[in-house]
Amino acid sequence: MKNKKKSPTVGKGAIRIFLTIVVSRNWTPKITDIKFAFLQGKKLDREVYIKPPVESETAEGFVWELKHGLYGLKYGARQFYMSVRDELLSLGFRQLKLDPAMFTLIREGSLIRIICCHVDGFLHAGNETFETVMCKLRQRFPAGKIEEGNFRYIGFQITQNTDGIKLDHSLYMEKLDHPHIEPQRASQKQEQLNAEEQKLYRKLVGQLNWAVQGSRSDLAFELVDLSTKLKGGSVADLLRAIKNIGKLKDIRPVQLFQSLREKSTEDWEIFVFSDATLGNINSGKGSTGIHIIWIKDRKGNCYPICWQANKIKRVVRSTIADEALAYKMD
């Protein structure tokens, strides 16, 4: 890990891969919360001191030396992650290269369990015959609440029923505020944003970014374009950001995962759809490219796993120009 202060957390793409495998094997997804997680992490590899809390009634002039991480300490989450990783590896799990917070357990060539880590929350599923593995993990890390089949996880509602597994992102959308701008100010579209408006604009772009990553790939271009105005946005840009927040509330973003026909992951394929010029940036200083990664079986059933849009420096005016430039770059 390049940054020794940060802790890997499972990505949204890895969660979709997890759900694709789980529903195809007819497993039940579960979550387990760990009690006092940071106190169960590895010992700190440096000296860290804190001022004792008032409730401890420690004599004045004394400080405490921390042996383990605490909530709020920038090293705390990483130390807990390292402890979890080492324990899983000792139990025979493999850490996946595609996501360092995702682990698999294989016995006699067959996948029997998957665990995804997000700070102190484990998302997991597997063959119930090997539930003893989870018992060993809970002995090492005492667990609190354990839920299965219907629960919330990092902003998603995950629900399993006879149709499959639903990944519902509407809980996040419902919590978003939909701000309004006074009509007089809204009419001054070309005016630069003041400090307060700039703060609001950054907040809205951040909310849109989280929504796009989670479910709303249809607004990826809007996100990239609005992100280019973070340092010099206008009232028109703010109004556009507000409009896009409104769009987030218009649709309930639910992705349904159903079983792929081939049970073995060896029979699945990954393919990528990409568009080198999804749209030109409004400032005329670039365009936007996008790619979407899918998993499919040999019958053609497929699920989008992850997507990303990004700014490209070149600007094109037609499809022919785009294809010609792409050919030249190859």
Regions found by a protein language model. Name each.
Residues I31-I34, Q258, E266-S283, Y327:
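Two-metal-ion RNase H-like nuclease active-site motif
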Residues R16-L19, E148-L256:
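C-terminal reverse transcriptase regions that engage the nucleic-acid substrate
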Residues N209, F273-C306:
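Acidic, metal-ligating active-site segments
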Residues M1-D86, G126-N127, L137-A143, E174:
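Catalytic-core region of right-hand nucleic acid polymerases
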Residues I31-A37, V63-L73, K97-G126, G149-T159, ...:
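Catalytic palm active-site di-aspartate
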Residues F80-K136, R140-K145, A211-E222, K299-P304:
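Active-site palm subdomain of RNA-directed nucleic acid polymerases
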Residues F38-P52, G69-G76, L105-P142, T159-K166, ...:
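Catalytic palm subdomain of template-directed nucleic-acid polymerases
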Residues K2, I293-L325:
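A short, polar/acidic, helix/strand-boundary loop motif
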